[in-house]
Regions:
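Low-complexity, flexible helical/coil segments
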Residues: 38-43, 63, 137-140
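Membrane-embedded multi-pass helical conduit in multi-pass membrane proteins
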Residues: 50-127
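Catalytic donor/gating beta->alpha subdomain of glycosyltransferases that bind UDP-sugars
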Residues: 1-43
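Histidine-centered active-site/metal-ligand motif
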Residues: 12, 47, 110
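Short linear functional motifs in flexible/disordered or boundary regions
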Residues: 22, 37, 44, 119, ...
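Membrane-interface anchor segments at the N-terminal boundary of transmembrane helices
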Residues: 41-52
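Short linear elements at protein peripheries
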Residues: 124-140
Length: 140
């Protein structure tokens, strides 16, 4: 049962640095795998998207630096998509500064979650080890 309580006060802790934000989303990726290990229904195909994006973007970046002439288009396409999404976010916020912030925040969020998800997936599903916690010290 869901109830709306308009007078309820909800405290939200914002991350004060990009490193703390990275740790937070990394742990979310780890937590999703741990939840999926408890109940398969809590691990849906959509949860794999940041991990897939992390792998594909890493490969595209690697191949761009190996052979920039032949692999430049894919790299440019990825940067163009990032700029488009950042532009949509800035338009939504009605603040141009959001565009420049989102150019950094979006990759940190996707890569942080994706890396946590990938490492926890390998740890729990491939090596069949016990629960893994990710960042535990200096999390916040």
């Amino acid at each position: 049962k869901v109830v709306n309580i308009p007078e309820a006060i909800v405290y939200h802790r914002r991350r004060t640095t990009l490193l703390k934000f990275f740790r937070q989303v990394f742990n979310w990726g780890v937590a999703r795998i741990n939840l999926g290990k408890k109940n398969n229904k809590m691990l849906e195909p959509l949860h794999f998207a940041p991990a897939i994006i992390t792998i594909v973007a890493s490969l595209i970046t690697f191949y761009f630096f190996v052979d920039p002439i032949n692999n430049g288009r894919l790299f440019e396409l990825g940067l163009g998509f990032l700029m488009f999404v950042s532009g949509v976010g800035a338009w939504y916020m009605k603040d141009i500064r959001g565009f420049f912030l989102l150019l950094f925040i979006i990759p940190i969020q996707i890569f942080g979650y994706g890396l946590g998800f990938i490492l926890a997936f390998i740890h729990r599903f491939i090596f069949r080890r016990s629960k893994w916690s990710g960042f535990t010290k200096s999390y916040y």
